């Protein structure tokens, strides 16, 4: 179930050089309780347990909008409970075609070694570093895992660390979360899909 696209007018302009880091954790927002529902336990049929519904998926087609969404989730104290998707042409592709998508060569896709090398560089040196600035806390994705099929290649990253906060602080506010970042390209075009989730534990 996909959420609505966020319009440009909904957010403050993004300035990556001027984002304040998240210095300390706060209690879980009270509005989070509206996302809790009761379901029947699979382990003990007949009994109910409370679970947190998955967050609404927000979809974007511009990198700057996506990064602003991540920044806004931190500002709104929802940094541990969001799900965003980005469907875009990476900046190195747009630079090569002089911002004219009609000029993108059909060979610029996952089958091109140069495209894959450039995309991996973009992920490691730009996307993850920019997301870290937008989140306001440390991201520790490491090298990630590459999963490849005939039609697509996906870089999968997970961060299950303390994100630069002490265990005591995370325990005090019960703010433990995992981050998942998947970046996928296909053999059909230079379009790249990014899926970024922050999941409370």
UniProtKB/Swiss-Prot annotation:
Keyword Membrane: yes
The entry's keywords: Cell membrane, Membrane
Positions of region (Disordered): 1-48
Pfam family, any one: RGI1
Biased composition (Polar residues): 31-40
GO biological process, one term: energy reserve metabolic process
Location in the cell: Cell membrane
GO cellular component: plasma membrane
Topological category with respect to the lipid bilayer: Peripheral membrane protein
Family (UniProt): Belongs to the RGI1 family.
Known function: Involved in the control of energetic metabolism and significantly contribute to cell fitness, especially under respiratory growth conditions.
Name of the protein in its database record: Respiratory growth induced protein 1
Organism of derivation: Candida tropicalis (strain ATCC MYA-3404 / T1)
């Amino acid at each position: 179930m996909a959420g609505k696209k966020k319009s440009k007018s909904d957010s403050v302009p993004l300035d990556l050089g001027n984002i304040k880091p998240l210095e300390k954790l706060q209690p879980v927002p009270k509005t989070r309780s509206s996302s809790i529902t009761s379901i029947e336990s699979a382990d003990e049929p007949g009994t109910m347990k409370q679970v947190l519904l998955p967050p609404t998926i927000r979809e974007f087609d511009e990198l700057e909008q996506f990064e602003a969404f991540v920044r806004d989730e931190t500002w709104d104290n929802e940094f541990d409970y969001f799900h965003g998707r980005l469907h875009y042409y990476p900046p190195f592709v747009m630079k090569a075609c002089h911002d004219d998508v009609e000029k993108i060569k059909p060979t610029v896709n996952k089958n091109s070694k140069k495209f894959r090398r450039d995309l991996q560089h973009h992920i490691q040196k730009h996307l993850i570093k920019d997301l870290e600035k937008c989140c306001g806390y440390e991201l520790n994705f490491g090298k990630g895992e590459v999963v490849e099929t005939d039609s697509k290649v996906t870089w999968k990253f997970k961060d299950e660390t303390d994100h630069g906060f002490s265990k005591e602080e995370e325990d005090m506010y019960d703010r433990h979360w995992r981050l998942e970042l998947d970046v996928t390209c296909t053999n059909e075009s230079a379009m790249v899909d990014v899926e970024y989730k922050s999941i409370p534990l």
